[in-house]
């Protein structure tokens, strides 16, 4: 199934039914008085998360969703039938944004209850409501109210505890295969990973966490180069980042330069993302002798002045992966406990995630606008004809 993490849809709630103009008619009752009922309410539009859905692909093809209108009122004080609500099911982790106002209407991180995104119109009043001492036969009714209409952007961000990032071919997909049951495609060429992959990592029988692998980043990603920029937003909800580094690049390039380049791209894409805790994982140590690998890691750490955690692994051979998994599990459990017991820490983390998501949303929209402008400029240039007159 195609992975789609963004879609734009139009939703229209139903209109309320009109109130009824009616008078009671019975044998031997000449002036029965008004008995027009109210109109029924229109249908609301809701959005609800569903764990059985993992892509927004359906909303690429069906973009307009209309709830039914309420039925008009009837005589004998009968209220018109209200329309049924419609519920749009989306993956867990979907954010719903009003395109006209940029208001975030819902952030669906669980499946507890649906969220209303378009409110239906109320039914109109029948003429029975307008009877008075001076007007025993009112002919006045009211129309049903129109329902809300909105243009919405659905944005899917995967929910994971740990996010993997790094240059193409650093071994991220191999690592996620080594530590989880996920089976992403692995090959000896860049950009093998084209979409985010999720894997559940089990440290023990009852201890587990989720890791997300996104396409590799390259220099200039924050300006739209490569594939990874589109998927950086999926790291917004992770608790920490694993920066996977190829310790023995085939092109002889410097791993330290790769680390700096990725850090720069993170900061340019979202300063809040650059603030996320990040661990260095040096991969492919099996391609070097033990003492050579350790010496190279020490030299890189010294050159960068790195103060965070450092791990050495060979994802292909499974070396060092178990130690990494237990270290990650312990760190995640510590953070979960802190969020439950320390309100200040929980508030700070929530603020960081909110800033990260806002910055990521703004940056992605900027890049899309730039891409549209570039395409428009190319189209304009295609029709330019230069005429040169020569003697």
Swiss-Prot record:
Q: Can you give the residue ranges of the Obg domain?
A: 1-159
Q: Ranges of Acidic residues compositional bias? A: 378-391
- Database matches in InterPro entries: G_OBG, GTP-bd, GTP-bd_Obg/CgtA, GTP1-OBG_CS, GTP1_OBG_dom, GTP1_OBG_dom_sf, OBG_GTPase, P-loop_NTPase
Q: Which domain of life is it from?
A: Bacteria
Region listing for Disordered, in residue ranges: 367-391
Q: Which residues bind GTP?
A: 166-173, 191-195, 213-216, 283-286, 314-316
Q: Where is the composition biased (Basic and acidic residues)?
A: 367-377
User: What range(s) does the OBG-type G domain occupy?
Assistant: 160-333
Group of enzyme by EC: hydrolase
Q: Name one GO biological process term.
A: ribosome biogenesis
Q: According to the UniProt entry, what is the EC number of this protein?
A: 3.6.5.-
Q: Which coarse location class applies to the principal site listed for this UniProt protein?
A: cytoplasm
Locations listed in the record: Cytoplasm
> Can you tell me which residues bind Mg(2+)?
173, 193
Q: Which parts of the chain are coiled coil?
A: none
Q: Which Pfam families match?
A: GTP1_OBG (PF01018), MMR_HSR1 (PF01926)
Its biological function? An essential GTPase which binds GTP, GDP and possibly (p)ppGpp with moderate affinity, with high nucleotide exchange rates and a fairly low GTP hydrolysis rate. Plays a role in control of the cell cycle, stress response, ribosome biogenesis and in those bacteria that undergo differentiation, in morphogenesis control.
Instruction: Spell out the PANTHER family in the cross-references.
Output: DEVELOPMENTALLY REGULATED GTP-BINDING PROTEIN-RELATED (PTHR11702), MITOCHONDRIAL RIBOSOME-ASSOCIATED GTPASE 2 (PTHR11702:SF31)
Q: What is this protein called?
A: GTPase Obg
The opening ranks of the lineage are:
Bacteria, Pseudomonadati, Pseudomonadota, Gammaproteobacteria, Oceanospirillales
């Amino acid at each position: 199934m195609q992975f789609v993490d963004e879609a734009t849809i139009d939703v229209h709630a139903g209109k309320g039914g009109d109130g009824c103009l009616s008078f009671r008619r019975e044998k031997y009752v000449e002036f029965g008085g008004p008995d027009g009922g109210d109109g029924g309410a229109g249908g609301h539009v809701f959005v609800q998360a569903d764990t059985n859905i993992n892509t927004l692909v359906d909303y690429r093809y069906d973009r307009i969703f209309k709830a039914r209108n309420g039925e008009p009122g009837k005589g004998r004080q009968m209220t018109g039938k209200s329309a049924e609500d419609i519920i749009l099911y989306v993956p867990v982790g979907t954010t719903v944004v009003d395109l006209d106002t940029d208001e975030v209407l819902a952030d669906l991180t669980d499946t507890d209850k649906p969220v209303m995104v378009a409110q239906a119109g109320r039914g109109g009043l029948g003429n029975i409501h307008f009877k008075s001492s001076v007007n025993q036969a009112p002919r006045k009714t009211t129309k049903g109210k129109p329902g809300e209409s909105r243009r919405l952007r659905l944005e899917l961000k995967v929910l994971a505890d740990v996010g993997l990032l790094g240059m193409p071919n650093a071994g991220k997909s191999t690592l996620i295969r080594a530590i989880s049951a996920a089976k992403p495609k692995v090959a000896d060429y860049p950009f093998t990973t084209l979409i985010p992959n999720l894997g559940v990592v089990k440290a023990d029988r009852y201890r587990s966490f989720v890791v997300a692998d996104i396409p590799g980043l390259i220099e200039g990603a924050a300006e739209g180069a490569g594939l990874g920029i589109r998927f950086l937003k999926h790291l917004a909800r992770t608790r920490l980042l694993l920066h996977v580094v190829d310790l023995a690049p085939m092109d002889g390039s410097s791993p330290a330069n790769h680390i700096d380049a990725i850090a720069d791209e993170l900061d340019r894409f979202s300063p809040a993302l650059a603030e996320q805790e990040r661990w260095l994982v040096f991969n492919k140590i099996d391609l070097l002798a033990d003492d050579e690998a350790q010496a190279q890691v020490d030299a890189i750490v010294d050159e960068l002045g790195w103060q965070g955690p450092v791990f050495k692994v060979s994802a292909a051979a499974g070396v060092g992966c178990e130690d990494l998994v237990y270290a990650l599990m312990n760190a995640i459990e510590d953070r979960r406990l802190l969020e439950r017991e320390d309100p200040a820490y929980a508030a700070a983390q929530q603020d960081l995630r909110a800033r990260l998501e806002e910055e990521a949303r703004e940056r992605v929209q900027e890049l899309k606008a730039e891409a549209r402008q570039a395409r428009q400029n190319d189209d304009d240039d295609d029709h330019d004809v230069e005429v040169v007159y020569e003697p």
